């Protein structure tokens, strides 16, 4: 069967998908994809896979793709990060029989992508991207797609998209933020950029960004003219987003746990999903947050889910008519709803009106107001002091400024002490360095071995550079 392209690929292979679950590292695993498909998702992406590791490691391929084969999990697009055309194509060839298309990640803005030189940090290397897409388009039996972020300039974003289309990209997902817009600085995605790209290319376009409910999906399609809308954060907080429903948080949690029992995944994935799904409820019942963080088994997670369900039902029974949700939430905490990420100014020290936590610790010498991580450490180590005023003060090394050993005979740190003791053939019992003692023992032992002494005695060297002993041996 010939490889379908562009709109024919979108309409026939992908079934004209409009509701799409984004590729999310450690989050869009098989169990979550199946849950999302049950609630309106028409197309899913795998988590981003590292192309080089996928080619090199058979276990990585097995754990991240080959063991996750499920007839219900189609259509499916496998996403790779890569910066080498040959490696990208080799990985894609190994994956193409398990999916409907291969996607190249050109949108990841995280520091790990910068260090690895992939994702959004390739967006200025157009020649490299052209070679990667062209080679994949020529050699794969399935279409190649791309997920990108925008440039600040609309015209440059349009030229970028047209370059990828010309190289062989058959479907383009446009995240309407720049690579600098992330975390607290995420801001609002630009649908104007997405609209301009959609008008300028002749392939299907998916929009990504600012999608928190079904109304956002419909408005985005209407405003930009895209073929589909991709959701990441919104999907994590409400997997029923594409149905236009906001069910109780425990309802979707129980359904997800049932799927995980059939299609197991690492417990860290499960825990991360429930932290997102229960975000607002865990602000109210913080003890459950601690319990969820501690459990080590799926049964333990299910027990926490049951406890959360009972707490929420108690809150519902006490809820009085006419009372609005707390903290300006659009719905009560037990209802699936979007999470609005605080802006950079909301959490800044300038607006907090207080001093840093470390300064307060040093002044008060108390554990109040510390982070949960430090409180956990205190519980695990009850005899350890966290009061800075009680911590021992270390004198500095005379040479490098690092803390010196309290019992060092040279008043140095271990590194400097080792160099000096070796140079002077001296001992430092404080650091356990016994160069002098070991040398004396070695000489004393050799003195008791007359045969060894004779073997080590070398005769005068001949003009040719070899000792007479060596010369006679070669004769």
Swiss-Prot record:
Its EC number is 1.3.1.88. The keyword tRNA processing applies. This is tRNA-dihydrouridine(16/17) synthase [NAD(P)(+)]-like. It comes from the Eukaryota. It comes from Mus musculus. One of its GO terms (molecular function) is flavin adenine dinucleotide binding. One of its GO terms (cellular component) is nucleus. Its cofactor is FMN. The lineage of its organism: Eukaryota, Metazoa, Chordata, Craniata, Vertebrata. GO terms for biological process: tRNA dihydrouridine synthesis. It catalyses: 5,6-dihydrouridine(16) in tRNA + NADP(+) = uridine(16) in tRNA + NADPH + H(+); 5,6-dihydrouridine(16) in tRNA + NAD(+) = uridine(16) in tRNA + NADH + H(+); 5,6-dihydrouridine(17) in tRNA + NAD(+) = uridine(17) in tRNA + NADH + H(+); 5,6-dihydrouridine(17) in tRNA + NADP(+) = uridine(17) in tRNA + NADPH + H(+). It is found in: Cytoplasm; Nucleus.
């Amino acid at each position: 069967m010939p490889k379908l392209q562009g709109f024919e690929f979108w309409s026939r292979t992908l079934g004209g998908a409009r509701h799409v679950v984004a590729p999310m590292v450690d989050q869009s695993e098989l169990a979550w994809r199946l849950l999302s498909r049950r609630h309106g998702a028409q197309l899913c992406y795998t988590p981003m896979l590292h192309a080089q590791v996928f080619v090199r490691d058979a276990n990585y391929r097995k754990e991240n793709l080959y063991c996750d084969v499920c007839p219900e999990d189609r259509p499916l697009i496998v996403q790779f990060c890569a910066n080498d055309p040959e490696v990208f194509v080799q990985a894609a060839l190994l994956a193409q029989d398990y999916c409907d298309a291969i996607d190249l990640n050109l949108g990841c803005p995280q520091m790990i992508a910068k260090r690895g030189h992939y994702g959004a940090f390739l967006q200025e290397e157009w020649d490299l991207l052209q070679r990667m897409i062209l080679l994949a388009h020529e050699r794969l039996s399935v279409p190649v797609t791309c997920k990108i972020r925008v440039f600040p300039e609309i015209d440059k974003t349009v030229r970028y998209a047209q370059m990828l289309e010309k190289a062989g990209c058959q479907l383009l997902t446009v995240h309407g933020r720049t690579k600098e817009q992330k975390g607290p600085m995420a801001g609002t995605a630009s649908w104007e950029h997405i609209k301009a790209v959609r008008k300028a290319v002749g392939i299907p376009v998916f929009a990504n960004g600012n999608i928190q409910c079904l109304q956002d999906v419909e408005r985005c399609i209407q405003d930009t003219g895209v073929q589909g809308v991709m959701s990441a954060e919104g999907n994590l907080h409400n997997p029923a987003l594409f149905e236009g429903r906001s069910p109780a948080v425990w309802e979707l949690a129980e359904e997800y746990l049932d799927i995980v029992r059939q299609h197991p995944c690492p417990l860290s994935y499960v825990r991360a999903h429930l932290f997102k799904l229960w975000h607002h409820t865990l602000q109210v019942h913080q003890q459950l947050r601690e319990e969820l963080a501690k459990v080590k088994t799926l049964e333990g997670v299910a027990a926490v889910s049951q406890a959360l369900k009972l707490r929420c039902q108690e809150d519902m029974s006490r809820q009085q008519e006419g009372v609005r949700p707390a903290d300006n939430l659009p719905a009560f905490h037990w209802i699936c709803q979007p999470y609005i990420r605080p802006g950079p100014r909301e959490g800044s020290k300038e607006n907090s009106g207080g001093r840093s936590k470390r300064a307060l610790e040093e002044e008060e010498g108390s554990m109040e107001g510390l982070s949960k991580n430090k409180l956990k450490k205190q519980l695990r180590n009850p005899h350890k002091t966290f009061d800075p005023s009680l911590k021992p003060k270390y004198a500095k090394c005379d040479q490098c400024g690092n803390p010196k050993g309290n019992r060092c005979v040279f008043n140095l740190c271990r590194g400097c002490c080792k160099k000096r003791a070796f140079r002077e053939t001296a001992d430092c019992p404080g650091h356990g360095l016994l160069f002098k003692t070991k040398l004396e023992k070695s000489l004393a032992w050799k003195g008791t071995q007359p045969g060894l002494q004779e073997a080590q005695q070398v005769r005068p060297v001949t003009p040719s550079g070899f000792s007479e002993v060596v010369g006679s041996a070669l004769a």
